[in-house]
Swiss-Prot record:
Claim: Aminoacyl-tRNA synthetase is one of the keywords in the record: yes
Protein source organism: Ralstonia nicotianae (strain ATCC BAA-1114 / GMI1000) (Ralstonia solanacearum)
Primary gene name: aspS
Any one annotated GO CC term: cytoplasm
Name of the protein described by the UniProt record: Aspartate--tRNA(Asp/Asn) ligase
HAMAP family: Asp_tRNA_synth_type1
EC main group: ligase
Catalytic activity: tRNA(Asx) + L-aspartate + ATP = L-aspartyl-tRNA(Asx) + AMP + diphosphate
Family: Belongs to the class-II aminoacyl-tRNA synthetase family. Type 1 subfamily.
Residues engaged in binding L-aspartate: E172, R218, H455, R496
Pfam families the UniProt entry points to: GAD, tRNA-synt_2, tRNA_anti-codon
Positions that bind ATP: R218, D219, E220, Q227, E489, G541, L542, D543, R544
Summary of subunit composition and partner proteins: Homodimer.
PROSITE patterns, per database record: AA_TRNA_LIGASE_II
Amino acid sequence: MRTQYCGQVTEQLLGQSVTLSGWAHRRRDHGGVIFIDLRDREGLVQVVCDPDRPEMFKVAEGVRNEFCLQVKGIVRARPEGTTNPNLASGKIEVLCHELTVLNASVTPPFQLDDDNLSETTRLTHRVLDLRRPQMQYNLRLRYKVAMEVRKYLDDKGFIDIETPMLTKSTPEGARDYLVPSRVNAGQFFALPQSPQLFKQMLMVSGFDRYYQITKCFRDEDLRADRQPEFTQIDCETSFLSEQEIRDLFEEMIRTVFQNTMSVALDAKFPVMEFREAMARFGSDKPDLRVKLEFTELTDAMKDVDFKVFSGPANAEGGRVVALRVPGGAALSRGDIDAYTKFVEIYGAKGLAWIKVNEVAKGRDGLQSPIVKNLHDAAIAEILKRSGAQDGDILFFGADRAKVVNDAMGALRLKVGHSDFAKSTGLFEDAWKPLWVVDFPMFEYDEEDARWVAMHHPFTSPKDEHLEYLETDPGKCIAKAYDMVLNGWEIGGGSVRIYREEVQSKVFRALKIGDEEARAKFGFLLDALQYGAPPHGGIAFGLDRVVTMMAGADSIRDVIAFPKTQRAQDLLTQAPSPVDEKQLRELHIRLRAAEAKVAAPAAATA
């Protein structure tokens, strides 16, 4: 039905007959001559319909946007002055000899070149939305990335092995999606949050190097970078050290970027310990494009009269930091007020600041309502540690460490991505990858009064920290590593526990008793007793990687049929009710939703 794609018709085909198939992107009637921009996945070509072929011309008169067409004609050069340098086919046009309407279209609900559509409209009419050139580009980029990953891993001796989609519920992380079993009444499968345990058992089975590009499922509240079902590049290896694993997959990401986008990432990614990342940036996924970082002031603020600073400085788990913004004294009071409201989102009670007008004058060269509350030694230490220069502004965070890290880390990004930062060289438009390593093994859950795994409970502690599993879990450092790119964690992995006695100690540190561990993870504990090899791996979020490469606002723009932030598919209207017969077969009875009790009306005078 065609000899070429529309976007591949160029001047090299001048004088040749072509058969094209595609959609009417736009139809124009110019003085009795009809022009149709014919579109397919490769691009557009201009089709000219002259009235000297009456039968064909009559068909052209009835064509409307999104009609599916077949065109037969001759490639000719466009008249002088009518070429379009923005199109690959912009120097030629096709003189139509035969025009067939393969299928008409009702009037589309929107123009495909409308850039102001709501996401609801786009997802409801996803079939049409996917015809848009940007969406075609995004999904083809996704395909190219996946193919480059496969090529690289195949060349490195990895084997693509599928693991089950129906598995056992082990609710240690996000909520599982549960699937009721019809055959085993009252029992449930879970959709996998990752193939973690299966890939570890494949290592025990001797497969040595495994990968798959697979769907994973998590029933969690959604954000711009989350979906209930997402695609993971999942990898595991045996007999490689942590450094060897990182080197292997660092090269994979370099290869993917080079071969799909002609982007050369750093020859060697920098490596930063978790502790350093939190100290300098308040985040374990720092965006290194932003040239701002924290100045630690906790110890220097212990004896000041300003309780906003001295309180957290003397409290266990408190922190005081400054964020120096070079040239920031030019920010208006309105800018500062906006930043103050912004940090309140993250739990900060306010945002102290000092404008540095003239460093040499000390206290007298500073502009701020808080200067009067700080003694000279404290002011001198702030200026010295921060490296403040004339014309700078210093923002301060003082609270519990988590609040300071969250609020000031977010402020760093907010300021760093602003027009002000971009115009003053505080933001570098580049690809900035790094590894973050040496994560804490555990973090303490105050609500449940127990330790929880920072990554997952199958991550190995550093060899020298094994003793802390039973004496002081908070001191344990894990053999875990994240690959971070421009402030996004695109991959995370670890060296795994491969000895049963160590895995059991980790479960006990997590307050998972031997009986519960046996019930939930007995298959793993048994497998580890059969000469399990040292192994480790990593998983990359394909959706996130492609989102970054495409410059998209959301991962929904790189997934063909995504869910909304309410976990709904607006195209198919899923999820949806099912009939009573299906529920009976699954041994399920629905309870009526509990009515919400209305709040009592306020009394009126």
